[in-house]
Structures are given as C-alpha cells and as structure tokens.
Swiss-Prot record:
Domain of life: Eukaryota
Subcellular location: Vacuole membrane
This protein's encoding gene: vac8
Disulfide pattern: none
Family: Belongs to the beta-catenin family.
Source organism: Aspergillus fumigatus (strain ATCC MYA-4609 / CBS 101355 / FGSC A1100 / Af293)
Cross-referenced Pfam families: Arm
Name of protein: Vacuolar protein 8
Entry keyword set: Lipoprotein, Membrane, Repeat, Vacuole
GO molecular function, one term: protein-membrane adaptor activity
Gene Ontology cellular component annotations, sorted alphabetically: fungal-type vacuole membrane; membrane raft; Myo2p-Vac17p-Vac8p transport complex; nuclear membrane; nucleus-vacuole junction; phagophore assembly site
SMART domains with a match to the protein in the record: ARM
InterPro entries per UniProt: ARM-like, ARM-type_fold, Armadillo, Vac8
Amino acid sequence: MTAIANACLSCLSAVDRWCHITACLGPIGGRSRDGIYETTLADNEREAVSDLLGYLENRAETDFFSGEPLRALSTLVYSDNVDLQRSASLTFAEITERDVREVDRDTLEPILFLLQSSDIEVQRAASAALGNLAVNAENKVLIVALGGLTPLIRQMMSPNVEVQCNAVGCITNLATHEDNKAKIARSGALGPLIRLAKSKDMRVQRNATGALLNMTHSDDNRQQLVNAGAIPVLVQLLSSPDVDVQYYCTTALSNIAVDASNRKRLAQTESRLVQSLVHLMDSSTPKVQCQAALALRNLASDEKYQLEIVRAKGLPPLLRLLQSSYLPLILSAVACIRNISIHPLNESPIIDAGFLKPLVDLLGSTDNEEIQCHAISTLRNLAASSDRNKELVLQAGAVQKCKDLVLRVPLSVQSEMTAAIAVLALSDELKPHLLNLGVFDVLIPLTNSESIEVQGNSAAALGNLSSKVGDYSIFVRDWADPNGGIHGYLKRFLASGDPTFQHIAIWTLLQLLESEDKRLIGYISKSDDIVQMVKTISDKNIESDEEDGEDGEAEVIALARRCLGLLGNGPKQTLVEG
C-alpha cells in the first residue's frame, strides 16, 4: 500500500507555523529586559538560535539537512531547554513536510533523540518529521537501523492522540519496506498497533489499520499478526464508516486468508466474516468492492466457504461486479466465482443466477489473459457434474466462442478452452452438436501446439468425441486435413514416447475401429505407420518397478492389442480386456 505521509501536526497553515517558530525563537535569541534568556542560554545555544533565525528568513534557499543549518538545529535539539527542543522539533517537522529526500544519520539521530523527550509538543513534532522522512525508501531502512522503532512504540502508547497518530503513521510508512517488516513484527509493535486500530480517533485508526495491512505481505509476518490477535479487530472494523479503514481491513483479511491455517481459524471464530464481505461488495467505492471479492476468492479456496458464500447471497453482487466496466472489479469477481464454482453443489445455483452469458461474453470482450482463464475455467467447472449443465453451457455459446478465439489467445487460455471442450465432449448427447460446430478445425491443429497441456487437452477432446458418436463422417472427412488431420495427430502421439499421449491416441484409435464405419476403418488399415507403431507398443514387455507405471503401461499394451485384433493383426493369444 502507499505510505501515509500526512502527519497529525497542526491545523495551522505552513506560513502560520513558520511564524510560530520564529516568534518562539525571537525572544529566546534576543536580550530581554530582565536578562532571563541571557542567563539561561549557553553561548553556543544563543548563537545557534541567532543563526537559525537567519536561516529561517531565507528558508527557500537553505539546506537544513547539512552544514551549519543542521549544526544549529542539532544544538537546539541537545539543549536542556525544552523551548529550544520544541523549536527544533517544529522546524524539523516543517522542513521535512516540504523537502523529503534521502538523509544521513546526522539528520536522523537528532530527530530520534527528540522522540525520547517527555514533552508532548516535542514528541508530536519529532514524530511528524520522522514520518515525513520515512516516505523515502533509503530513510525507511536507516530509521529502523538506528533504533527508531523503540521510541515510536513508546509514543504509540502515549495518552496524547496527536502523538499516537504521528507515531503510527511513521510506522505505517516504515512497514512498506520489505527489509523492515520482519523487524517491526518482532519489535513489539503489533500489540500497540492492534489496540490503536480500535481508537476513537479516525486518523489513528486509519494509520493503524494501514500499518497492519503492510504487515500481511509475508507468511511469517501474517502468522505473528494473527497470533497477536489481529483477526477479530480487522473483522470488526469491516463495518467502519471510513472507506480507507474498510479498504485496509478487507485487504489485510484477504492476505491473511491466503494461508490454509488462517482460513481454518477464521472459519472457527469469525461467523460474520462472509456476510460482512458480501455486504462490502455493494460498497460505493470500487477499491473496497474489489478487495471484498478478492477476500472471498481466497476464502473460497476451502469447500466450507465455497458453500457459505452462496448461502450468504454472494452471487448477485458478484454478478454485478462481473458485468462492471472496470477491469479490476471484473477480475476480482471472476476469480472469486471461479473458486466458488469448484463445488459441485454450486454449479446449478451459479447457472440459475445468470452467470453463463456474462462469462461467455468475457471470453471475447477483453484481452486480459487472467480474466479469460478464470471465465473459461468457471464454465468448465459448471459443466463438470451433469449433462443438463453441459447443455446449458453449450447453449450459452461457450463452444462457439472458444472455437472463434482459441487459435489466437495465449497458451494459458488455449489450455483452459481445450480442457472445457474436452469436458463438454463427455456428454453423448452433445457430441453431434460439438462436431457440427466445427471443433475439429481447431482441435486437430492444437494437438501440435508448443504447449504440452494444450496438446493433451485437445487430444482428450478428440478422444471423447470419437466414442459412440454415431455418425463418423466428419472423422472420415478430416482424416488427412487440416494440419495432417486425425491421421497426423495419431501418428505424432503414438511416436511421442509419452505414455499418457500414447494412451490417449490408442484409446481414440480403438473407438474409431469400433465405429463400424468402413471408410474410416479402411483409412486406418492402410496407414502402415500407425499400424506399425501400435504393433511395436503391443509387443512391449513391462519392466517398470513402479506399480502405478506398470498398471498404466499394461493398459496401453492391452489397448494396442485390442486395436490389432480389430485390424486382424492381433497376436494369437487371448486379448486382455482393458
């Protein structure tokens, strides 16, 4: 997340604050009638005050982070006079608000010293200055290396809200750097941050929840945060009226839900979580809607949550997000529905809720690879368990859309699309429809894809379509074309040496030989290359030491022998039934 740079310093304008600084320094640097300042200030302090007043007069041209201006400020910092320390801390706060850059320890050490003051005004301004400097990446690391966490943690426990706000804001900025996150988690800061997340002051609450979010980006830090008791607070704050707090808490919980152990804990202790997240999907703020859907997506990695989200009426808001024109909302919604669709009991509710057409439309309405993958994967899941749902997916135009797009989408999308066609091709009733749609025009070329997954899925789809289809005229037509046709695909897979590919090819070949289509069987019989490779496989002796491998190879050999038997070239011994 972005750093929080607006420190809770004062409601005065910048000009007013500069005037305030010079007004405070003026009487200190001058000689009063009763001589109090003259006697209480050391010579070097009086000189530093005088110099600083001059630098402030020309502040636009002055570099306060080095040389004499920094020495003058440092003299005030290490003074025993609290008024001088106040002026120094306020000056640091002002110059860092307008000039944030990488600084060295000579600048940071005086500010860290001021943090240890018992004076509230000094604490407040010093932590504001440190928070401003902590926007710079190099400064973040150096502040922690110089021991800045300890005084900041102490200030988080201050009774003063302004001090709390600045200290938490500074830690929020420090926690955006990867090098600091584990150190912050081990520093004792998590407990105070969690307590301040419940602050009645919205600025403190906002900074604290932002800091907690920054601590959720690694496994170890997430676990420490969970162990420190952050989950109930984050869940409670989902109902905050503040949009930023909602966003920070939703995103933090989304990150926490990445871990299976945390999802289990959430399921055991946070019964209102899903309902709260479903409600936030109807937020008027897109970033909150997006993170709510992503949090539900991560929760839906578990079966329990897949069902609970549907029961909590999560489908209607997800459908609205899916049909949004804002890409991040579409992506978060389609990723969520993809996980929800994994559960067989959710297939029909999702279809009945009206998701099919929007999911099909997403395939062609965006070039976003991730959205396309999630959309077609969801359609495949929805078709997995029943022929009714397979038919509805087909009627929604999924196969036609895949056929139109599959040869020009990225490999990852091709893999998902061919897998979806393979699932739909399991339905005997749909096979003629799929063939009439011309899926061979894309499946056959894709068996020669550069992607092993695309090759395998395409061949599996061809295999499923070859079984009990009734009319094999399309197989006859496409025996040699396109791209080598069915013959070329079988030849490549049989010659591949890959047991899985050989299994698919021989099983497909067996279906074609059992088709009773004389022309098709004639083509196969005349394909000496295919027949010879099947013979070679059938003559193999199993020598695998692994039982699974032995069973798989035995099945391939058995299928090869059955093919040869149907071709009239089988061995004399009894054929093994596969």
